[in-house]
Amino acid sequence: MQGLVEFVLSNFIFTLINLWIMYWVLKKFLFKPTTEYMEGRKKSIADSIQEAEMKNKEADESKAQYDMKLQDIKKERSQIIDEATKRAEKRGDEIIKAAEDEAEKVIERAMTEIQREKQKSLNEMKNEISQLAIAAATKVIEKDLDEGTHHKMIQQFIDEVGETKWQN
């Protein structure tokens, strides 16, 4: 037994050739498909990441648009509420003004009615006083003058003396 391990050049060359053939076969049939699969998977993952980023970007843009729309809706809501409040206040003022105008008209009509009733009462009192004066004058004179003359005399008396007293 000379040495357990002996260097034989032919074995070494044969082993190198076998290794090279094995490397070539592995490269051709194992490494290349594995590398292609890994590259494809890498590309697929990169595409998925890129697509996810695009969708995130689109989602952010959509969210920004919705936020803007929401702000616009809030502004519009505030404007509508303000306009409705102003219209309600204006309508309330119009109703109050109409009520005040109507109250003034009622007061004016009442004052006119009071004046008319006052004048009517004064005229009735004048007529009654005239009748009483005629009756008193007839009794005093004991002579019956015609009614037209009596009435004329009484009316003249009332106009001269009583007019200032009736107005007070």
Swiss-Prot record:
Q: Which CDD domains match?
A: ATP-synt_Fo_b
Q: Which GO terms describe its cellular component?
A: plasma membrane; proton-transporting ATP synthase complex
Q: Which domain of life is it from?
A: Bacteria
Functional description taken from the UniProt entry:
F(1)F(0) ATP synthase produces ATP from ADP in the presence of a proton or sodium gradient. F-type ATPases consist of two structural domains, F(1) containing the extramembraneous catalytic core and F(0) containing the membrane proton channel, linked together by a central stalk and a peripheral stalk. During catalysis, ATP synthesis in the catalytic domain of F(1) is coupled via a rotary mechanism of the central stalk subunits to proton translocation. Component of the F(0) channel, it forms part of the peripheral stalk, linking F(1) to F(0).
Tell me how this protein sits in the membrane.
Answer: Single-pass membrane protein
Location in the cell: Cell membrane
Write the gene name.
atpF
Q: Which InterPro entries match?
A: ATP_synth_B-like_membr_sf, ATP_synth_b/b'su_bac/chlpt, ATP_synth_F0_bsu_bac, ATP_synthase_B_chain
* Gene3D superfamilies, sorted: 6.10.250.1580
- Kindly provide the name given to this protein in its UniProt entry: ATP synthase subunit b
- Molecular functions (GO terms): proton-transporting ATP synthase activity, rotational mechanism; proton-transporting ATPase activity, rotational mechanism
Q: Which UniProt keywords apply?
A: ATP synthesis, Cell membrane, CF(0), Hydrogen ion transport, Ion transport, Membrane, Transmembrane, Transmembrane helix, Transport
Main localization category: membrane
Transmembrane feature ranges? 7-26
Q: Which family does it belong to?
A: Belongs to the ATPase B chain family.
Its assembly, as annotated, is: F-type ATPases have 2 components, F(1) - the catalytic core - and F(0) - the membrane proton channel. F(1) has five subunits: alpha(3), beta(3), gamma(1), delta(1), epsilon(1). F(0) has three main subunits: a(1), b(2) and c(10-14). The alpha and beta chains form an alternating ring which encloses part of the gamma chain. F(1) is attached to F(0) by a central stalk formed by the gamma and epsilon chains, while a peripheral stalk is formed by the delta and b chains.
